[in-house]
From Swiss-Prot:
It holds the Pfam family Metallophos. Disulfide bonds: none annotated. One of its GO terms (molecular function) is phosphoprotein phosphatase activity. Its cofactor is Mn(2+). The gene is SHLP1. The keyword Metal-binding applies. This is Shewanella-like protein phosphatase 1. Residues 1-23 form the signal peptide. It comes from the Eukaryota. Its EC number is 3.1.-.-.
Length: 362
């Protein structure tokens, strides 16, 4: 903590002694961020992680907002053959991307993350990978904003002690802070961009790695804007965690919003954008701009649907893009696929699958 404070003092002293006119304000921050990262690297090499050019030759599975619903998550992972009956990873050469918002509303956010971190380690042994993206609800928790936390979660996983939970998320040495702060807000895999909230013409002036780094640094700065950065506020609705103007408006102004989308995709040399955050009222994956823009927050959590889960996932395999919808029921006699979940609750689901092809129309 002392090292961190001293580092910021040195940075601000540097700014104070720079003569006016020596350089433009917008040109200062790259040097400052570079030196900040070099110093912090001594403590945490994750500041140098790059997410702007990940190459993957196998299948990709993308999952949207979970909001504490571990049953929907496990139904997806079982159906897509990523985990077995014992909840261990079994998928060969598969990339799983979870697009943020694991926490809040539901109860099981903490054990979902523990489970996903476990799968990250297991997947490596199967030539697979799990990428977890930061959502705005992860950011809210890291910033100490707990308005969406289910009280039952505090009771079950934090000894019914809100202060204990606060320490776990807000204190830099807290159990969940240490792990969640490393999650990237934005990732590019092949020609696909994944981010939680969305993109806009303003934020897309920055590189993926700059967005990830500066979003993290603002959270570490007590979630306050960093004064010497020209963009200022990465936790606002202009930042990738919250930006939803495109996803909210594209159903009504598709031509205009798709024009913006393709400008942004060209900037990043990408063809597709996958976002969560904006709940789809149909409980199915939304697709716009000739299947180049996918909205995968289907409001799946049973905690927001009176106990009814709506699990969906995006599957990309052999250049084929499909939305997979799982129609879930509890039936004694199941004419479809029966999936037995054993933890945290022993429950049997009858699952019917519906797939929609989402490749662009040529």
């Amino acid at each position: 903590m002392i090292f961190k404070k001293a580092l910021y003092i040195l940075l601000f002293l540097y700014i104070a002694i720079v003569k006016k006119g020596e350089s433009k304000p917008g040109s200062k921050h790259p040097f400052l961020f570079k030196n900040l990262v070099i110093d912090k690297k001594k403590l945490d090499s994750s500041y140098y992680n790059k997410y702007d050019n990940i190459k993957w030759n196998g299948k990709i599975i993308a999952i949207g907002d979970i909001h504490g619903d571990i049953e929907s998550l496990k139904l997806i992972l079982r159906h897509s053959k990523l985990i077995g009956e014992n909840d261990n990873w079994i998928g060969d050469n598969v990339l799983l991307v979870q697009n943020g918002d694991v926490f809040d509303r539901g109860i099981y956010g903490p054990i979902i993350y523990n489970f996903l971190f476990k799968l990250q380690k297991e997947a490596i042994k199967k030539n697979s990978r799990v990428i977890l993206i930061m959502g705005n609800h992860e950011q809210l928790n890291l910033c100490g904003y707990f308005n969406y936390v289910n009280p039952k979660e505090i009771e079950m996983f934090f000894h019914n002690d809100a202060n204990y939970r606060y320490h776990s998320f807000v204190n830099p040495y807290g159990e969940y802070h240490k792990r969640l702060i490393r999650l990237p807000p934005m990732v590019k895999v092949n020609n696909i961009i994944f981010t939680h909230g969305g993109l806009n013409l303003l934020i897309s002036k920055l590189s993926i790695n700059d967005i990830n780094l500066k979003t993290r640094l603002q959270i570490e700065n007590n979630c306050k804007p960093i004064k010497y950065d020209s963009f200022q506020n990465y936790l606002s609705r202009d930042g990738v965690l919250w930006s939803d103007a495109m996803s909210r408006n594209v159903p009504y102004y598709e031509k205009e919003k798709c024009s913006e989308l393709f400008q942004i995709l060209d900037k990043y040399d990408a063809k597709y954008l996958v976002v969560g955050h904006t709940r789809q009222p149909s409980h199915q994956i939304g697709s716009y701009c000739n299947n180049h823009y996918f909205l995968i927050d289907t409001g799946m959590s049973l905690f927001t649907n009176y106990g009814q889960p709506y699990p969906n996932y995006l599957k990309i395999d052999d250049h084929k893009i499909k939305a997979v919808r799982l129609i879930v029921e509890k039936k004694k006699k199941c004419p479809h696929t029966e999936i037995q979940l054993n933890t945290p609750n022993k429950i049997k689901y009858c699952v019917q699958e519906s797939q929609t092809n989402l490749n662009p129309v040529l």
